[in-house]
A protein has these predicted regions:
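Beta-rich nucleic-acid/ligand-interaction surfaces
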Residues: 69-81, 181-182, 266-274
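Short amphipathic alpha-helix that is part of the acyltransferase structural core
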Residues: 29-98
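C-terminal/domain-terminus segments
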Residues: 259-294
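Short, conserved charged micro-motifs
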Residues: 47, 149, 285-289
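Short beta->alpha transition motifs characteristic of CBS
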Residues: 100-106
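Conserved N-terminal entry element of GNAT/NAT acetyltransferase domains
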Residues: 2-43
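Short, solvent-exposed loop/turn segments at secondary-structure junctions
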Residues: 44-45, 105, 141-142, 178-182, ...
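Acyl-donor binding region in acyl/amide transferases
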Residues: 67, 107-258
Length: 294
């Protein structure tokens, strides 16, 4: 934890969380690891929102990031026109074990969209993409949740798939992926180079207001097959003591049609480097579609 950060807020009584959970309809009933999925607005479930904000800050500080506040919560989490929260709930242990926040472009107050605080949206993105998109962000899984943590992210992806299937007209997922501030600088350069090379932006739809430009260096990705370059990236990152960040890894496996845009340093998130992404839903691999979107 960064020494200057104040302590994270203490957990709330489980009974407060259970009371709010009991008033929600499960998006997906308890399955593997006894997890159930729920979606809610922070303004309607203040105790759950506080617990999610506490767990987010705890998770992000654990990798050198975080907001530096006692809770990772902003006005967009509590605005009735802002984000909805998706959580994985471990009923056996009465706790939240993972979460995402999401916002549907066609029905939101655009001022609540986190990506818009750091990236300018092109007129074409505003017209042709945003009304058919869901922004995703702030994903986390609780590390000390035992077996439940192993299923949390998979369960959350199933929940997101259910949301996509229910939201008529949704064609795109977008948002920001994060490289922790503690990530080795050369490993970060290689990862950003790989993303630009193999997941390039086809046009300037999302433009960072203050672009992060990594230092120049050698380009080792000269193999003809994507799979060989991917294996090389993993090898090079390991040499620097790093791995592909989990969410970047997940999106890379979700679709080869993902586009990555500018990188920027987020001063509100521990100076982590974040990259804007856009992913067409119909480009998601068949295996992932069958597993998650139904």
């Amino acid at each position: 934890m960064t020494p200057s950060f104040p302590p994270i807020a203490p957990p709330l009584y489980a009974s407060l969380l259970e009371d709010e959970i009991s008033r929600l309809t499960p998006l997906l009933g308890a399955a593997r690891g006894a997890l159930a999925l729920y979606s809610f607005r922070g303004c309607n479930c203040p105790a759950l929102m506080q617990e999610v904000a506490r767990l987010r800050e705890q998770a992000f500080r654990g990798v050198g990031g975080g907001t530096g506040r006692v809770l990772d919560m902003d006005s967009n989490d509590t605005n009735p026109s802002g984000y909805r929260q998706l959580v994985a709930w471990d009923a056996a242990h009465h706790r939240v074990v993972g979460g995402y926040r999401y916002i549907v472009g066609a029905e939101c107050d655009r001022r609540c969209i986190s990506t818009l605080h750091y990236f300018d949206f092109s007129p074409r993105f505003e017209r042709d993409f945003l009304p058919h998109a869901i922004e995703l962000g702030r994903s986390f899984a609780v590390r000390d949740a035992g077996a439940s943590s192993l299923f949390a992210m998979q369960s959350l992806w199933q929940g997101l798939g259910r949301i996509v299937a229910r939201c008529e007209g949704v064609k795109y997922l977008f948002g920001k992926v994060t490289i922790p501030p503690t990530f080795d600088a050369e490993a970060r350069r290689l990862l950003l180079l790989f993303l630009r090379r193999f997941f390039p932006a086809r046009e300037r739809l999302l433009v960072a207001r203050k672009v992060f430009v990594p230092p120049s260096g050698d380009d080792p990705f000269t193999e003809s097959r994507y799979e060989d370059n991917y294996a090389l990236l993993e090898h090079l990152l390991r040499r620097h003591g790093e791995r592909i960040p989990p969410m970047i890894h997940a999106y890379m496996r979700l679709s080869r049609e993902m586009q990555t845009f500018d990188a920027m340093v987020n001063p509100d998130f521990g100076n982590a480097v974040e990259v804007a992404i856009l992913l067409p839903v119909d480009s998601i691999t068949t295996a992932k579609r069958e597993a998650y979107i139904r």
